[in-house]
Each structure stands twice: as C-alpha cells, then as structure tokens.
C-alpha cells in the first residue's frame, strides 16, 4: 500500500502485529497445536540468544573452492528466529541476540560473489536478512545509528546484485543458445523469485517505495519475448521470465490459456523437476503474495 505523504504504509514484512497478537492469544488460551509448534521454535538451536554467528567479508556461492554462503544463511536464520521469539514472548535477550547477529554481518560483509550461483545467495540470504531486521526495527537496542547503518548495508551489498540479476539474468536474458532464442528466460523460477522477494523486502525495510515497486514490476509486467508451444505450431507469448505471475501460476487458476486436452494441471513452472525445488518456488511465491 502506498501513502503519498510518507511512502510505504508500514504493515511489516512477512508478519504483522495482528499475526503476533493472534499467536500470543492462542498460546495464552492453551491451544495445544499452537503451543506445540511454538515450543519447536523456542527449543530450536538457532533460536537461542547465546547462538554464535560467523560473518565473512565475502560470501561465496558456487565455484570449485571457498564456498561459505551457508554461514550467511545460518546467520540470517538465527537473527530471524530470535526476532520471532522476541515478538511472541517478549524475550529481550532474543531481540538483543538478533541485533547482535545482524550488526556483526553488516560490520563485516562487503560482497556476495562466486560463479553464477552467487545470485541464489543474494536472493535467498538477502531477503532473510531484510525480514529479520524488519521484525527488529522497533527494538531500542540497535545503538547509535545501528538500524540506519544496517539499512545502508542492505542497499549497498544486497540490493545491487539482486536487481542486476533480475535485469540481466547473468547475461542469459535472450537465451540465444537455446532453440535459436525462441525460448527466452534461462533461469527457472526459484532464481528470480528469491531475488524479486529480496528487492521487495529491502524496499519494505528501507521504506523505499521505488525499490518495492521495482521488485513488484518484474512479477506484474515483465515480458521478454515468445516461445514455441510444443503442442502446436504456433508461437505464443511468453508472459515474462519465470517469476512473472502469468507464466508462473497460469495452470493453477482459471485461464483461457488452459482449455485444451491438457486441462488445468495445477502446476507451477518448477513442478515436475523435483519436490524440493517445486516446494521452494511455491513458498517463495506465497511469501511474495503475503
């Protein structure tokens, strides 16, 4: 939502205060399923305020040696899970731990690198760090300019790579080598979905409606050409790259494009690849929609 007086209306990232109020009420009422689920989080290794993170100056994903991106993935998860505990149970030790972890990474990390797989680290870890910080924005333990410095880190280390990938797809935008260019869009949907989600999350965190709308534009309007439907001899519009809503979920909704013998398959672009990638694409799409 956009307020012309001050940019984004701040409802939060993946969670709103109403979400946390509902969870706390369910726990207080003794809802066994909610209490059981929350205890899993509360007892998780990464949700403990004593957990340690190990930031690196250069995050590397892909290549033959030196991969260390898992440190960033773990660090973001630690901050996020501790932030959840603070929002739900009011444990200030968890809030302080989340901020300690986020500041450690912001004070150390300067680059996301590797082979072409760097884009996965940028998108997945970028949105996780942004969402963790969003949960902790109202905690008063950031210190002098701590929150502002963290936002600058997201804008200088994470945002440029994510938007660069969405614009250029590591140089494969037209995909000339595949069928003479008639099937543009080399990357399957997990790649652009996580980077679009990172851009959107950074826009929310930084109260920047322009960056937020950049991420949304790739989902709403991105179009890169045509491809040939193997079932016919006709060229049909490729409604953008693989994160574009019309291309991503057309077979799960009512659409004039799904009226033939194949029917409505209820599948996404990653469906049929393997369970992990298909579930991940759905999860990323749901997070974006949320």
List each language-model region with its residue ranges.
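Extracellular glycan-targeting catalytic surfaces
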Residues: 1-185, 193, 197, 217-220, ...
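Residue-level signature of the C-terminal ends
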Residues: 136-139, 202, 206
């Amino acid at each position: 939502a956009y307020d012309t007086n001050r940019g984004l209306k701040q409802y939060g990232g993946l969670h709103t205060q109403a979400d946390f109020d509902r969870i706390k009420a369910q726990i207080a009422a003794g809802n066994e399923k909610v209490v059981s689920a929350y205890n899993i989080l509360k007892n998780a290794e990464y949700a403990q305020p004593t957990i340690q993170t190990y930031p690196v100056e250069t995050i590397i994903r892909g290549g033959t040696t030196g991969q260390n991106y898992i440190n960033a993935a773990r660090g973001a998860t630690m901050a996020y899970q501790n932030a959840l505990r603070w929002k739900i149970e009011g444990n200030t030790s968890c809030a302080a731990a989340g901020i300690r972890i986020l500041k450690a990474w912001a004070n150390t990390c300067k680059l996301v690198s590797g082979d072409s797989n760097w884009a996965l680290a940028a998108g997945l870890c970028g949105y996780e760090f942004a969402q963790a910080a969003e949960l902790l924005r109202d905690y008063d333990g950031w210190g002098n300019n701590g929150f502002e410095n963290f936002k600058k880190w997201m804008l200088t280390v994470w945002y440029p790579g994510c938007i660069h990938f969405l614009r250029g797809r590591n140089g494969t935008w037209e995909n000339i080598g595949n069928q003479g260019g008639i099937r543009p869009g080399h990357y399957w949907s997990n790649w652009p979905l996580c980077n679009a989600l990172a851009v959107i999350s950074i826009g929310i965190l930084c109260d920047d409606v322009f960056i937020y709308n950049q991420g949304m534009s790739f989902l709403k309007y991105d179009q890169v050409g045509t491809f040939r439907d193997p079932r016919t001899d006709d060229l049909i519009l490729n409604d953008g790259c693989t994160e574009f809503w019309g291309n991503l979920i057309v077979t799960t909704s009512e659409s004039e494009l799904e009226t033939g013998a194949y029917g409505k398959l209820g599948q996404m672009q990653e469906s049929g690849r393997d369970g992990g990638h298909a579930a991940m694409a759905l999860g990323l799409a749901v997070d974006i929609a949320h």
